[in-house]
Each structure stands twice: as structure tokens, then as C-alpha cells.
Amino acid sequence: MELNFMRILATIINFIILILILKHFFWDKIKRAIDARQEAIDETILKADEDAEKARRLRLDNERILKSAKEDGRKLREEQKKEADRIYKEIVDDAHREAESIINRANIEIQREEEKVKYELKQQVVDISVMLSEKALGESIDESKHRELINDFIEKVGI
């Protein structure tokens, strides 16, 4: 196989002419198609980056909102617990005051009853003493004077 220099040269020249013709008629269209494709790819990448950034911001916002909601819930629980404790303390304090009031009224009533019983007992002692004196003496004595004497005696004795 022999190399034909003229043929090689003609092929190279034909190839160069073909490239020049293609460049002249089609290079701008190919360049525009490549540029358009590159621009579309760049826009897609940019949009993907923007979407990723937007998703990241949304995630951060959601995390912040969730954290805030948890904190608000915790504060609300604490406030409700404090309010419940306050109401509980108020109820217990009211119950203690009421119990104290009942005990005080009962003590006052007991003192009244005790005074009443003492007075009634004193009157019975006076009546019995007057009756015994009359029986012992066999006659009636001045009852008011006798009662006064007996009352004085009882006061001195401390009944």
C-alpha cells in the first residue's frame, strides 16, 4: 500500500473546507444550542441550590418554631402547676381557717356550757344547803340572807 501524497493532501484540504463550510453555516446554531443547554444546566443547578437553601431555611424555621412551641408548652405547664399549687394552698389554708374557727366556736361553746353547769351546780348546792339548814334548825330562816351567806361561802371555797 503506497502512500499517495497528493491524495492525503487533497483529503486534508477537503476536510478543512468541510470544517469551514460547517463552521460558516452551522457553527452559530451549534454554539447557540450548546450555550442554551449550558444555560439551562446552569439555571437548573442554580434553582436546585436555591431550593436547597430554601429547604434549609424552612427546616431551621420549623426547628425554631418547634423549639418555641416546646418552650411555650413548658412555660404553660409551669404556670398551670403554679396556679394549681396556689389554688391547692388556698383551699388548704381555707380549710385550716375553717377548722380553727370551728374549734374556737366549740371551745367557746364548751366554756359557756361549763359556766352554765357551774352556775346550775352552785344553785343546786345553795338550794340543798338551804333545805338542809331548815331541816336542821327545824324552822324557816330568811331565805335571801341564807342564800347570800351560802353564795359567799361557795365563792370563797372556789366552786
UniProtKB/Swiss-Prot annotation:
Keywords: ATP synthesis, Cell membrane, CF(0), Hydrogen ion transport, Ion transport, Membrane, Transmembrane, Transmembrane helix, Transport. CDD domains: ATP-synt_Fo_b. The keyword Membrane applies. The keyword Membrane applies. It is a single-pass membrane protein. NCBIfam families: ATP_synt_b, PRK13461.1. The chain crosses the membrane at residues 8-28. GO terms for molecular function: proton-transporting ATP synthase activity, rotational mechanism; proton-transporting ATPase activity, rotational mechanism. It is found in: Cell membrane. GO terms for cellular component: plasma membrane; proton-transporting ATP synthase complex. F(1)F(0) ATP synthase produces ATP from ADP in the presence of a proton or sodium gradient. F-type ATPases consist of two structural domains, F(1) containing the extramembraneous catalytic core and F(0) containing the membrane proton channel, linked together by a central stalk and a peripheral stalk. During catalysis, ATP synthesis in the catalytic domain of F(1) is coupled via a rotary mechanism of the central stalk subunits to proton translocation. Component of the F(0) channel, it forms part of the peripheral stalk, linking F(1) to F(0). InterPro entries: ATP_synth_B-like_membr_sf, ATP_synth_b/b'su_bac/chlpt, ATP_synth_F0_bsu_bac, ATP_synthase_B_chain. Belongs to the ATPase B chain family. It holds the Pfam family ATP-synt_B. This is ATP synthase subunit b. It comes from the Bacteria. F-type ATPases have 2 components, F(1) - the catalytic core - and F(0) - the membrane proton channel. F(1) has five subunits: alpha(3), beta(3), gamma(1), delta(1), epsilon(1). F(0) has three main subunits: a(1), b(2) and c(10-14). The alpha and beta chains form an alternating ring which encloses part of the gamma chain. F(1) is attached to F(0) by a central stalk formed by the gamma and epsilon chains, while a peripheral stalk is formed by the delta and b chains.
